[in-house]
Amino acid sequence: MKIVIASSHGYKIRETKTFLKQLGSFDIFSLADFPDYYAPKEIGSLPEDNALAKGLHAAKELNSWVIADDTMLMVPALNGLPGKFSATFAGEDACDKDHRKKLLQEMQSLESIVDRSAYFECCVVLASPEGKFFKSRGICEGYISNHEKGSSGFGYDSLFLKYDYKQTFAELSEDVKNQVSHRAKALQKLTPYLQDLLEKHLVSRN
Protein backbone atom coordinates (compact mmCIF):
# COMPACT_ATOMS: atom_id res chain seq x y z
CA MET A 1 0.00 0.00 0.00
CA LYS A 2 1.28 3.45 -0.96
CA ILE A 3 1.78 6.06 1.73
CA VAL A 4 3.54 9.43 1.50
CA ILE A 5 5.47 11.07 4.33
CA ALA A 6 4.64 14.77 3.98
CA SER A 7 8.17 15.98 4.62
CA SER A 8 11.41 16.64 2.77
CA HIS A 9 13.44 16.56 5.98
CA GLY A 10 15.84 13.62 5.87
CA TYR A 11 15.79 12.82 9.58
CA LYS A 12 11.99 13.00 9.87
CA ILE A 13 11.64 10.78 6.81
CA ARG A 14 14.07 8.21 8.19
CA GLU A 15 12.39 8.13 11.61
CA THR A 16 8.90 7.72 10.12
CA LYS A 17 10.07 5.13 7.58
CA THR A 18 11.60 3.04 10.36
CA PHE A 19 8.28 3.07 12.19
CA LEU A 20 6.20 2.18 9.10
CA LYS A 21 8.47 -0.69 8.08
CA GLN A 22 7.87 -2.33 11.44
CA LEU A 23 4.13 -2.43 10.75
CA GLY A 24 4.05 -4.08 7.34
CA SER A 25 4.44 -3.77 3.59
CA PHE A 26 3.92 -0.10 2.85
CA ASP A 27 5.25 1.44 -0.37
CA ILE A 28 6.79 4.48 1.30
CA PHE A 29 7.40 7.79 -0.45
CA SER A 30 8.19 11.31 0.76
CA LEU A 31 7.88 14.82 -0.64
CA ALA A 32 11.43 14.40 -1.92
CA ASP A 33 9.89 12.07 -4.53
CA PHE A 34 7.56 14.82 -5.75
CA PRO A 35 9.80 17.80 -6.66
CA ASP A 36 6.91 19.75 -8.22
CA TYR A 37 4.74 19.57 -5.11
CA TYR A 38 4.22 22.90 -3.36
CA ALA A 39 3.73 22.61 0.41
CA PRO A 40 1.50 25.17 2.17
CA LYS A 41 3.15 27.62 4.55
CA GLU A 42 2.92 26.71 8.23
CA ILE A 43 0.89 29.43 9.94
CA GLY A 44 -0.85 27.54 12.75
CA SER A 45 -0.32 28.37 16.41
CA LEU A 46 -0.54 24.69 17.45
CA PRO A 47 1.19 21.57 16.07
CA GLU A 48 -2.26 20.14 15.31
CA ASP A 49 -3.10 23.08 13.02
CA ASN A 50 0.00 22.66 10.89
CA ALA A 51 -0.02 18.86 10.77
CA LEU A 52 -3.67 18.79 9.70
CA ALA A 53 -3.18 21.45 7.01
CA LYS A 54 -0.09 19.69 5.65
CA GLY A 55 -1.69 16.26 5.72
CA LEU A 56 -5.00 17.13 4.05
CA HIS A 57 -3.33 19.27 1.37
CA ALA A 58 -0.72 16.66 0.46
CA ALA A 59 -3.23 13.79 0.48
CA LYS A 60 -5.52 15.61 -1.95
CA GLU A 61 -2.77 16.88 -4.25
CA LEU A 62 -0.87 13.57 -4.38
CA ASN A 63 -3.98 11.37 -4.34
CA SER A 64 -2.55 9.17 -1.62
CA TRP A 65 -2.78 8.40 2.06
CA VAL A 66 -0.32 10.71 3.81
CA ILE A 67 1.41 10.98 7.18
CA ALA A 68 2.17 14.55 8.23
CA ASP A 69 3.50 15.93 11.48
CA ASP A 70 4.42 19.14 13.20
CA THR A 71 6.46 19.67 16.35
CA MET A 72 6.97 22.64 18.62
CA LEU A 73 9.35 23.12 21.54
CA MET A 74 7.80 24.89 24.52
CA VAL A 75 9.76 26.51 27.37
CA PRO A 76 7.34 27.60 30.14
CA ALA A 77 9.85 30.12 31.56
CA LEU A 78 9.83 31.85 28.16
CA ASN A 79 6.03 31.97 28.06
CA GLY A 80 5.93 28.96 25.75
CA LEU A 81 8.57 30.09 23.28
CA PRO A 82 9.91 29.04 20.84
CA GLY A 83 6.44 27.45 20.34
CA LYS A 84 4.99 28.26 16.93
CA PHE A 85 8.29 29.96 16.09
CA SER A 86 10.33 26.79 16.70
CA ALA A 87 11.42 26.58 13.05
CA THR A 88 12.07 30.32 12.71
CA PHE A 89 13.14 31.37 16.22
CA ALA A 90 16.28 33.18 15.06
CA GLY A 91 14.73 34.34 11.77
CA GLU A 92 13.15 32.94 8.62
CA ASP A 93 16.49 32.21 6.95
CA ALA A 94 18.37 31.07 10.08
CA CYS A 95 19.69 27.53 10.48
CA ASP A 96 19.12 25.09 13.34
CA LYS A 97 22.35 26.15 15.02
CA ASP A 98 21.20 29.79 15.00
CA HIS A 99 17.90 28.81 16.63
CA ARG A 100 19.73 26.87 19.35
CA LYS A 101 22.10 29.78 19.96
CA LYS A 102 19.18 32.18 20.38
CA LEU A 103 17.45 29.80 22.78
CA LEU A 104 20.56 29.56 24.95
CA GLN A 105 20.85 33.35 24.97
CA GLU A 106 17.22 33.74 26.02
CA MET A 107 17.78 31.27 28.88
CA GLN A 108 21.11 32.64 30.17
CA SER A 109 19.65 33.78 33.48
CA LEU A 110 17.82 30.49 34.13
CA GLU A 111 19.94 28.09 36.16
CA SER A 112 17.87 25.36 37.80
CA ILE A 113 16.44 22.35 35.98
CA VAL A 114 12.98 23.50 37.06
CA ASP A 115 13.50 26.92 35.46
CA ARG A 116 14.96 25.29 32.35
CA SER A 117 12.12 22.80 31.96
CA ALA A 118 10.78 22.32 28.45
CA TYR A 119 8.71 19.93 26.41
CA PHE A 120 8.28 18.88 22.82
CA GLU A 121 4.73 18.57 21.53
CA CYS A 122 4.14 16.67 18.30
CA CYS A 123 0.96 16.08 16.34
CA VAL A 124 0.85 13.41 13.63
CA VAL A 125 -1.98 13.21 11.10
CA LEU A 126 -2.89 10.30 8.85
CA ALA A 127 -4.97 11.73 5.98
CA SER A 128 -6.76 10.33 2.94
CA PRO A 129 -7.33 11.92 -0.51
CA GLU A 130 -11.05 12.15 0.34
CA GLY A 131 -10.39 14.29 3.41
CA LYS A 132 -10.70 11.59 6.06
CA PHE A 133 -8.09 11.84 8.80
CA PHE A 134 -6.87 10.46 12.11
CA LYS A 135 -4.64 12.44 14.45
CA SER A 136 -2.52 11.73 17.49
CA ARG A 137 -0.38 13.69 19.92
CA GLY A 138 2.90 12.95 21.63
CA ILE A 139 4.62 14.94 24.38
CA CYS A 140 8.13 14.52 25.72
CA GLU A 141 9.07 16.43 28.87
CA GLY A 142 12.56 17.38 29.93
CA TYR A 143 14.81 20.41 30.21
CA ILE A 144 17.27 22.51 28.21
CA SER A 145 20.99 22.00 28.75
CA ASN A 146 23.18 25.08 29.19
CA HIS A 147 25.35 23.97 26.26
CA GLU A 148 25.09 21.76 23.20
CA LYS A 149 25.90 18.06 23.49
CA GLY A 150 25.89 15.43 20.77
CA SER A 151 25.98 15.51 16.99
CA SER A 152 23.01 13.39 15.93
CA GLY A 153 19.44 14.47 15.33
CA PHE A 154 18.37 17.96 14.28
CA GLY A 155 16.59 21.07 15.51
CA TYR A 156 16.92 21.45 19.27
CA ASP A 157 18.02 17.83 19.89
CA SER A 158 21.51 18.76 21.10
CA LEU A 159 20.01 20.94 23.87
CA PHE A 160 17.11 18.78 25.06
CA LEU A 161 17.43 16.20 27.84
CA LYS A 162 14.48 13.98 28.65
CA TYR A 163 13.83 13.57 32.37
CA ASP A 164 15.57 10.44 33.74
CA TYR A 165 18.09 10.51 30.87
CA LYS A 166 21.64 11.83 31.13
CA GLN A 167 22.04 12.33 27.39
CA THR A 168 20.52 14.86 25.03
CA PHE A 169 18.42 13.63 22.13
CA ALA A 170 21.47 14.27 19.93
CA GLU A 171 23.49 11.81 22.03
CA LEU A 172 20.92 9.02 22.07
CA SER A 173 21.05 6.21 19.53
CA GLU A 174 18.36 6.30 16.85
CA ASP A 175 16.86 3.11 18.26
CA VAL A 176 16.40 4.66 21.70
CA LYS A 177 15.13 7.99 20.41
CA ASN A 178 12.66 6.20 18.13
CA GLN A 179 11.12 4.65 21.24
CA VAL A 180 10.94 7.64 23.60
CA SER A 181 10.60 10.79 21.48
CA HIS A 182 7.47 12.91 21.07
CA ARG A 183 7.17 11.87 17.42
CA ALA A 184 7.57 8.19 18.31
CA LYS A 185 4.79 8.46 20.90
CA ALA A 186 2.45 10.14 18.41
CA LEU A 187 3.22 7.61 15.67
CA GLN A 188 2.65 4.67 18.00
CA LYS A 189 -0.88 5.91 18.74
CA LEU A 190 -1.69 5.67 15.02
CA THR A 191 -0.71 1.98 14.84
CA PRO A 192 -4.31 0.59 14.94
CA TYR A 193 -5.40 2.84 12.06
CA LEU A 194 -2.35 2.00 9.94
CA GLN A 195 -2.78 -1.73 10.55
CA ASP A 196 -6.45 -1.45 9.60
CA LEU A 197 -5.50 0.29 6.34
CA LEU A 198 -3.04 -2.47 5.50
CA GLU A 199 -5.58 -5.20 6.20
CA LYS A 200 -8.25 -3.54 4.05
CA HIS A 201 -5.71 -3.04 1.26
CA LEU A 202 -4.74 -6.73 1.31
CA VAL A 203 -8.40 -7.79 1.27
CA SER A 204 -9.19 -5.53 -1.69
CA ARG A 205 -6.24 -6.96 -3.63
CA ASN A 206 -7.47 -10.50 -3.07
UniProtKB/Swiss-Prot annotation:
Its EC number is 3.6.1.66. Mg(2+) binds at D70. NCBIfam families: RdgB/HAM1 family non-canonical purine NTP pyrophosphatase (TIGR00042). The active site is at D70. Pyrophosphatase that catalyzes the hydrolysis of nucleoside triphosphates to their monophosphate derivatives, with a high preference for the non-canonical purine nucleotides XTP (xanthosine triphosphate), dITP (deoxyinosine triphosphate) and ITP. Seems to function as a house-cleaning enzyme that removes non-canonical purine nucleotides from the nucleotide pool, thus preventing their incorporation into DNA/RNA and avoiding chromosomal lesions. GO terms for molecular function: dITP diphosphatase activity; ITP diphosphatase activity; metal ion binding; nucleotide binding; ribonucleoside triphosphate phosphatase activity; XTP diphosphatase activity. Transmembrane segments: none annotated. GO terms for cellular component: cytosol. This is dITP/XTP pyrophosphatase. InterPro entries: dITP/XTP_pyrophosphatase (IPR020922), ITPase-like_fam (IPR029001), RdgB/HAM1 (IPR002637). It comes from the Bacteria. SUPFAM superfamilies: ITPase-like. Its cofactor is Mg(2+). It catalyses: XTP + H2O = XMP + diphosphate + H(+); dITP + H2O = dIMP + diphosphate + H(+); ITP + H2O = IMP + diphosphate + H(+). GO terms for biological process: nucleotide metabolic process; purine nucleoside triphosphate catabolic process. Belongs to the HAM1 NTPase family. It is an enzyme of class 3 (hydrolase). Homodimer. Binds 1 Mg(2+) ion per subunit. Keywords: Hydrolase, Magnesium, Metal-binding, Nucleotide metabolism, Nucleotide-binding. Substrate binds at S7, S8, H9, G10, Y11, K12, T71, F154, G155, Y156, D157, K177, H182, R183. HAMAP family: Non_canon_purine_NTPase (MF_01405).
